[in-house]
Amino acid sequence: MIREIVMPLQLTLTEGILPKGQEKLAFARLSEAMLKWHGLTGNKVMAPNVIGEYRVLPRDETFSGMQEAPVAIIEWKVPSFAFTDREVQLGYFAEATDIIFEMSGGKQPRDRIFINVVHTVDGAWNFNGHAMTNAEIGEQVAKGG
């Protein structure tokens, strides 16, 4: 069985949602939660492969309901076998929402914290410098446990 793995995180925040300078901590906490929910905390192969970026956008550049609004968007791009377990989906989404809500001091409404997952096609994942299948990724991750 292939163990689920995680990869790039793109965190997009409207300016002012988090106290200035807390974006890196939010990124780290969201990444750690992802590893935890996939049973990969401490995995030596996965830790260096959790990559990504955060962006802080001006208030007039983020929208909800087609209106300007402060939003937090947590988006993961992962191999097609990640996030397939409903318990992982529910658990991670709840924890990630809590992280942003708490770090905002309770100011960011939970209904303006959005999370989604984008799956890649099997074999179209760049891991260790070349395209790998889900099975090949699973073999590499198993070595890091």
What are these regions (language model features)?
Residues I2-G145:
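A domain-level signal for the structural core that forms small-molecule/cofactor-binding pockets
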